[in-house]
């Protein structure tokens, strides 16, 4: 970290100048660098950059705002959630998850219905980080998504939120052909700590996939911890 205030200002001024560079790559790198500084007072500069003509630059500015965890920038990020670029919308979901404010939930609930699966996945991840039960209904719906990565993130998010309303659907996913889905479902069930799932987890030790069996053992360990507590 730069200790000399004069040098700090010099570097900041340089980055701000670079945000006006003719090259989108340079502007994007400048936005990224501003996020690394970690000073929340820089957020207004990055908010202005959300209107850059280059999607690459907008993505970098969004990611930087997520790093700063600036709640004041949330309204601007919500607006960016309507961007025409898939990667920009994905970055919005990730940034909102990093900030972790429940104010962002309404926007994330819209993003889980996005036409792009990467956006839906990132929105599910973000909802898991925020951990509000308001998201449960939408996440349960995502367990039926056509994309396996989205289903994985939805199951993982439900485990983080810790609602037993997810148990019936998670149990169904233990029979899913995709081993990764069976694995994350077992992990999520273990996080819920309901002892009634113990027989199911024991049966899962007969799964053909070693990682699924490993996750079943891990989940059983988590349930056992709940019982001891």
Predicted regions and their residues:
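Core register positions within helices of long alpha-helical scaffolds
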Residues: 2, 33-36, 64, 95-98, ...
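Eukaryotic acidic, serine/proline-rich intrinsically disordered low-complexity regions
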Residues: 1-8, 25
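Eukaryotic tandem repeat interaction scaffolds
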Residues: 121-125, 148-159, 170-173, 179-187
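A generic tandem-repeat structural signature
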Residues: 54-98, 114-125
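Amphipathic alpha-helical scaffolding segments comprising HEAT/armadillo-like alpha-solenoid repeats
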Residues: 5-18, 39-51, 70-82, 101-113, ...
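Short inter-helical turns and helix N-cap capping residues of alpha-solenoid HEAT/ARM repeat scaffolds
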Residues: 22-23, 53-54, 84-85, 115-116, ...
